[in-house]
Amino acid sequence: MEILESIDFIEVLILDNLGAIIIVAVIVGTYLYMNKPPPPPPVFNKPNNKINKEAQKPKKTITKNEDGKKVMKIFFGTQTRTAEDFSRIIEKECKKIGIPCEVVDLESYEHEQELHSESFVMFLVATHGEGDPTDNAKEFYLWLTNDERPTDLLNGVPFTVFGLGNKTYEHYNAVARVIDRRMEELGGKRVFERGEGDDDATLEEDFNRWKKDMWPVVCKFLGYELKSTEDDKFVPRFRMVTLNQDSKDINDPFIKIVSTPLKPKLSTDNKVIYDMKNPYYAEVLENRELHSNESDRSCRHIEFKLGDEVSYTTGDHLGVFPINDSKLVEQLIKRLGVNGDDMIALVPIDQEGSVIKASFGPMTIRRAFSEHLDITNPVRKSVLRALAESTTNEEEKKRLLYLATEEANEEYNKYIKNDFRGVVDLLESFPGLQPLIAHFLEFTPRLPARMYSISSSPHNKNGVVSITSVVVNFTTGNQRAHNGVASTWLSHLKVGDKVPLFVRESHFKLPSAATEQKPVIMVGPGTGLAPFRGFLQELQHRNHSQQQQSLLFFGCRSDTVDYIYREELEQYHQSSVLGDLVVAFSRKTSQKVYVQNKLLEHKEKVWELLNKGAYFYVCGDGRNMSKAVQQALLSIIKEFGSKDDNSAQQFIDDMSSHGRYLQDVWF
């Protein structure tokens, strides 16, 4: 009883003094918190820079569609969109057979998380430059070729590969070959052998032959009945919508068409990266003629203002998106009987809703023809087949379908490729053709960017880049005039015009600062001089003793016609930025002299510099000149190095593998 009374007393005491107790508690708690000892420093595990091979192997789950069927992924790596076009052909044939498929840009694919779980993958990949992956395949390629990937990373993933290359390049289809090899090394299962196409000869035919043999094997592997894919009728993936000023479908004003938003890549410091998919619009600062009035050709020096948004290094390439000739565009508009000012968009056939994202556009038909469609290059066989469906004239249809067959390769090459017949030419030659504009916009290849060797150093003029462009125009065997799309357009640019462009990194570089005492030998006739102009500007900026150990071989027709940048070169020579300047004139006398001849004339000097570890550079025509230069170099190595053919070639191969023999060539 006393205990209970004591408890009651304490309870009353606490209640009567609760406010004071709380205040005291807060004061004490605050004091203890403010005066608590500091916590011990956190303990961090030592970072492991090596790849965790076990962590790379996420749980394997086979990719399936909504119906539970395995999905084929068709990956493309492209610089000119040809590989993407080929992937769409595979997609069309998949649908005919009944195979669920998805075409995927390698740049947007989450390869680390998804590749291990794919049920079947097909790679259609191009090789760009000197054995390099295309811009959109670079990240995937670097990931796949990392030597520390576990050998069972892609265990059992079925795959096949088709490569797009050019046999005139040294590293023919290198990217496709590496991807094919690495997929197998990492545990993938090769279902069908790798195919390779040669863009210098029969790329489209090579692709058609490969897929014809590929389908029976792949269908058997996936468990599908092989159905004929020989029916080459055009199957549209998009429908065209004509829009009003508010981008609403004029046939259904309740539907709004919007462009697909671009998500530009950002650098580590959150700056926008300008590339092929997101070009920078640069202002033209200068556009001047480099040839004399005596020349029957034209070569332009063009400078662009980059500002702080875009950077480059000496030897890089500049990609430029050209615009088709306006007269040709108007001719096409008239021939197809359309209104060039109509605002249109292409949207997926199966896409519905009040707001639809366009796959192409919105834009006017005139702009589509001007900036996006390749209307001048030789027509592909797939386009011939699509055009053939648009005529009621049986003779025209028969002729076009025949030209698209493998049996007609020789005639196709003679009539289409060698004569440079574009789609506008065919529409004029076959008056019965009347393709639907929606189909025409879809099956006509896109106008690719043109790549130019940069002819300046960023240290010469801050925020300025230059290119050197010879204007392409010639007459074919059938006396048909052909003008290069990009070079002609570039030649007409005025100061202040804006040009969509981007920088592409190149391996064509001067020796690094650590090895800059090594001599350099440069061989570049015609516009092959372009990167070497940048090299000389860079050497002048460095201002080191390497200047005395540089040798340039330049070639042109004569000193009064097309000796481009002559004053600059002579000034570099006089100021010792350039050690030796050797010029070959092919039309000055009855005896034609080329850069390879001059190499042999100066063979002692060339060998002396090679013995000092010289870097050897070749830029220009890859079909004839670069091969002739290499033959001259082989001759010098055999003579002064006392080597036979094989060991002389091995000498050059060793230079190449160590980055001392570099080529920047085109065809």
Curated annotation (Swiss-Prot):
**CDD domains named in the record:** CYPOR
What name appears for this protein in its UniProt entry? Answer: NADPH--cytochrome P450 reductase
Q: Which organism is it from?
A: Dictyostelium discoideum
- Could you list which ranges are Cytoplasmic topological domains? 30-667
Essential cofactor(s): FAD; FMN
Taxonomic classification, please?
Answer: Eukaryota, Amoebozoa, Evosea, Eumycetozoa, Dictyostelia
- Which InterPro entries does the record match to this protein? CysJ-like_FAD-binding (IPR003097), FAD-bd_FR_type (IPR017927), Flavdoxin-like (IPR001094), Flavodoxin/NO_synth (IPR008254), Flavoprot_Pyr_Nucl_cyt_Rdtase (IPR001709), Flavoprotein-like_sf (IPR029039), FNR_nucleotide-bd (IPR039261), NADPH_Cyt_P450_Rdtase_alpha (IPR023173)
Q: Name one GO cellular component term.
A: endoplasmic reticulum membrane
Q: How does it sit in the membrane?
A: Single-pass membrane protein
